[in-house]
């Protein structure tokens, strides 16, 4: 009725349902504190799987071939920028330049069973030349989990993955950006940590490098997913 009146239609009738017609709200638009608490609690329980890529993209470095040493399925804590942990990740990455203790605590809580069940003995992280925010988080998380944090990757300057036009460019960019430090030798199962997952090529390449150095299994973990397709 309100919209019809705005259009100057004189032939309007009361619907008998909306506030404009009956003079009051049939259902309250005020969100109770209890409902808000339940909504936040629900969002905090959202965990996304990081399904492993099993095939290389066709690039200037490789054909479209099978990845012979893929990652195991990993875990993503939140959806980037969304209420709850997703907001904390965004704030830590771009505002405070440090991920808060709540993210460390929650991550440790999420990962403890995986660490125990899979016998994960070390934590490796994806380095960045722009910031040490992931390194700092990884060190604190490893301490909370009671496993060593290892610094095994070398990173060279490159474009950001989100600036790449398609999967082939993202794959090529990641493969050219990362390498292992000289003499790196690994064994057992490793937790691979990054802050944000999108195309999964960074985690795929870094996980593959860990496998080539002797790691038996690599389990990715990311604080947030920024992909419209989510982490799967």
Predicted regions and their residues:
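Hydrophobic Val/Ile/Leu positions in short beta-strands of Rossmann-like dinucleotide-binding domains
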Residues: 125, 192-193
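Active-site-facing substrate-recognition patch
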Residues: 33-122, 135, 139, 153-189, ...
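Active-site signature of alpha/beta-hydrolase-fold catalytic machinery across serine-
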Residues: 136, 140, 205-209
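Residues at the starts of beta-strands that form the adenosine-phosphate
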Residues: 148-149, 189, 216-219
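A short, conserved beta-to-alpha structural element at the edge of catalytic cores
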Residues: 163, 207-232
């Amino acid at each position: 009725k309100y919209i019809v009146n705005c259009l100057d239609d004189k032939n309007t009738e009361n619907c008998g349902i909306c506030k404009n017609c009956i003079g009051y709200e049939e259902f309250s638009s005020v969100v109770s504190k209890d409902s808000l608490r339940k909504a936040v609690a629900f969002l905090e329980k959202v965990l996304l799987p990081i399904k492993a890529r099993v095939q290389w993209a066709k690039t200037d470095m490789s054909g479209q071939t099978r990845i012979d040493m893929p990652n195991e399925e990993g875990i993503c804590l939140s959806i980037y920028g969304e209420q709850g942990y997703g907001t904390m990740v965004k704030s830590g990455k771009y505002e405070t330049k440090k991920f808060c203790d709540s993210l460390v605590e929650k991550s440790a809580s999420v990962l403890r069973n995986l660490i125990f069940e899979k016998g994960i003995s070390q934590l490796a992280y994806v380095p960045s030349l722009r910031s040490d925010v992931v390194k700092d988080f990884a060190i604190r998380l490893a301490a909370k989990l009671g496993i060593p944090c290892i610094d095994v990757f070398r990173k060279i300057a490159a474009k950001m993955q989100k600036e790449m036009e398609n999967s082939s460019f993202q794959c090529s960019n990641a493969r050219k950006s990362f390498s292992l430090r000289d003499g790196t030798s690994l064994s057992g199962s490793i937790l691979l940590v990054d802050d944000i997952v999108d195309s999964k090529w960074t985690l795929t390449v870094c996980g593959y490098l860990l496998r080539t150095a002797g790691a038996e299994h690599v389990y990715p973990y990311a604080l947030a997913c920024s992909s419209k397709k989510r982490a799967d």
